[in-house]
Every structure is written in C-alpha cells, then in structure tokens.
Amino acid sequence: MYGKIRTIHFVGIGGIGMSGIAEVLLNLGYRVSGSDLRVSEITQRLCDLGGMIAYGHAAENLGDADVVVTSTAVKSDNPEVIEAHRRLIPVIPRAEMLAELMRMKYGIAVAGTHGKTTTTSMVSTVLSKSGIDPTVVIGGRLDSIGSNAKLGQGKFLVAEADESDGSFLKLSPIIAVVTNVDADHLDYYSDLDEIKRTFVDFINKIPFYGVAILCLDDPNVQALIPQVGKRFVTYGMSTQADYNAQEISYQEERTTFTVCWQGERLGQLSIRMPGQHNVLNALAAVAVARELEIPFEQIAEAFCDFCGVQRRFQPKYQGRDIMVVDDYGHHPAEIKVTLAAACSGWNRRVVAVFQPHRYSRTQALFDEFVTAFYQADHLVVMDIYAAGETPIPGVEARLLAEGIAGHGHRDVHYCPDAEAVAAHLREVVQAGDLVLTLGAGNVWQIGEALAEWLQQRD
C-alpha cells in the first residue's frame, strides 16, 4: 500500500473475517487499531501481536487512523463510521482491504455458499506443506497454524471469498474456486438468479491466464458453465468431472478415496474429515495444487497433516461411550450434508441441537429447514440467534420445531435457551450417542458444557 497509510482501524475487529486481515497487516508492519463489543480469544491474540483494541464503539476509538475498515455487520450509524466521515477518513469494506493484499500477490480465492472455509484451509495446508509458503486469510481457525491468518513469504495469497454482500467482486484472483451456489443471504440478494449472476461475474474476473475450478456436482454451478468465458476445470463425484473420486471409504472421521483426473488414476487420498462434502472440498484443493504443478504424491502427503478447522465437524469430547461434535452448519444444505457425514462415519444414534441463525434466514428458508433434519434421530431446536437482527413477527424457533414435526420427524423438541437444552440433554443422552451442535451462533457453548459435564461424570 502507498506509504502514507500507517494506521488502519477495524470496526468489529473481533470478527473472524476482519481479524485475519488485521493479523496479516500487523505482520506486515502496519499499526492496527480496532474496536469490538467484547473481549475474545481473537482480540486477545491481536493485542498480543501489537494491535490496539478498544471495547465498545465510540468516536474517540479512531485515534490517528488513516483508513477505517468495516465488516458487513457494521451499520452506517456506528459512531466510529460517523466520526470517520466527519474527519474525511476513507471508510472501506473488508473486501476492499483484502483485495489490496491480494493485489500484491497472486490470488487464489475460494467462493461458494458452503464449504469455503474448509476448502480454503485444505488449499492453504497443501501449499504450505509443499514449500510454497502462501499468505493465508481464512474464515475459521486452521488448527495447523493456530489462527485464521498467516503472512507467508511466497508469491501466493489464499483467501476465502465472501459472497454475502457481493463484495467478493472486489477481488481479482488468478485462480477462482466455486464450491456451490445456493439461496442464502436473501436479505441482500433479491433471489437465487441474482446470486448466480454475481458468481458468473466473480468467475469471469480472473485474467486470461487464470483458471476457474468448479464443482460439477452442484446443479447451480453447472448452470453457470455456459456463461464462463475463461478456462475452467471441474471436480465432482461423476466421471464427467475432470477430477473425480472413486472407491470412497468412510470410517468415523477418516475418509479414503482414489483421485482420478480425466480417467487417469492419480492415487489415493486420506483425509481426517467425514462426509462426501469433504471429499469434494479435497478434490477442489487437489485441482488448485495441480494447477501450481505440485506432484500428487506431495499433495497426498500434505493431507496427512491436515487436522481440520475450528467449528467444522470439530470433536469436543470422546468419552467411553458418548461423542460430542460441533459444526458451524446453519443453512439447510449444510445441515443435510453434516448429518449425512455423522451417519455414514459412525454407527451411533445422532442427537442434534440446532440453533437457527438470523430471523431473515429462518424466514426465507423455512420450507427448506423443515425437511433438513430427517437424518437426526433426536432433534432439539433452540431459540433463534439474532446476530444483530431485529426479530420478525411470526418467525420463531418454536414454529420451526412444529414445522419439522409436521413434516414427519417423530422426535423433535423445542428448548428455548441453553439452560433448557442442557437439562434436556442430561435427561435423554445415552450410551452410544453422537451429540452434534449445529449453528453459526453460540450453540457451541452447549456442546462444551455437555462435554465438561460428561467428563466429570466419567
């Protein structure tokens, strides 16, 4: 960046997307300040790296900032945003700052409604283990680096591309991955067709020497292909895909399969993550690595060290006879594949605890939610996590639970809060169960509390 930019201020610096960019900038030598509503592990890490963080939002937090970065969650009436405008300090979205970092490197951007974080993490791990040493900005904590960001010395930057508000169009990667396209963020987009058009624009932003890596299993991605004007390769389960998986074996958290490229067997890959959706994520990472001419043997070896991402089918407790797992899945499509992974890898009764995320999403996807949980043997639905939204009349978790029961689920229960859920779980959980917490809010805390109780009990 131009030398006169010294201090960069982040409003909402504790967010998973914001904190990664802030960490990279700190490691590049910039002064980074920020604000957030509460102390967290993320804000503490940034403070340890030299960040200056205030808690609560106030005009005086800006200090001597040269530029202010905001996330999509920050509203225009935020006092720090108002103060920045008053002082004529540039206010830019998170994606614009990420685009500036990407401009200094060769960018690899992973987009899609689901699977972005895991796929980005897999790509980052393979490139790092192959000596490429990329800069990494991910929307989740990658266990192998202990963070969601890393400043590398190599010439590539691997980033998760957030489509939620269309701002990923600010990025200019040379490799663009699209895992899938689904109806989500309908508080911003008018409908699925608009989402698909935005993804076409994203893909076609790659330069003439770049490549798009597209999931052929997803019908909405298939529908984009005739409009793609740049070179692309595909991946999926079908032999019609350039990269495909054969001879898949699921054994608890370990999934093993053979990778094929246009009919040629490249070799076997083993990943420590369950489910067909993670096979697809791994195929995308293989495709990226092969574009960078990394030999398949090195790719397979790198996957041996991939130990997952925080809140993506993350084991919280493995006792004598009960297992507790947490997952970020909060969209009907994500819920279905996560439950399928739990069923395919383990011969256990699945007890799912779901916390709906946002009133707008619950309302827009209600019909999809009521049929998404059929693979859960026992289901608990708790109150909606607002994520800053104002409640919408008639949009209630209780009605969602009733809708799920009305569509044939024979064992669904509504428990409004964490206390009620904890009491219910202690009553119903039995030997052989896999307890799965699902949602993008704070439902993970219920899993941790249950794990602590089980540990004391055992």
Curated annotation (Swiss-Prot):
Keyword Lyase: no
Catalytic reaction(s) noted: UDP-N-acetyl-alpha-D-muramate + L-alanine + ATP = UDP-N-acetyl-alpha-D-muramoyl-L-alanine + ADP + phosphate + H(+)
GO biological process, one term: regulation of cell shape
Positions that bind ATP: G112, T113, H114, G115, K116, T117, T118
Key words, A-Z: ATP-binding, Cell cycle, Cell division, Cell shape, Cell wall biogenesis/degradation, Cytoplasm, Ligase, Nucleotide-binding, Peptidoglycan synthesis
Pathway assigned to this chain's UniProt record: Cell wall biogenesis; peptidoglycan biosynthesis
Localization (cell): Cytoplasm
GO cellular component, one term: cytoplasm
EC numbers: 6.3.2.8
Alphabetized Pfam families for the sequence: Mur_ligase, Mur_ligase_C, Mur_ligase_M
Enzyme class: ligase
Record-level Gene Ontology MF annotations: ATP binding; UDP-N-acetylmuramate-L-alanine ligase activity
Disulfide bonds listed in the record: none
Family: Belongs to the MurCDEF family.
Record function comment: Cell wall formation.
Cross-referenced HAMAP family: MurC
This protein's name: UDP-N-acetylmuramate--L-alanine ligase
Originating species: Syntrophotalea carbinolica (strain DSM 2380 / NBRC 103641 / GraBd1)
Name of the encoding gene: murC
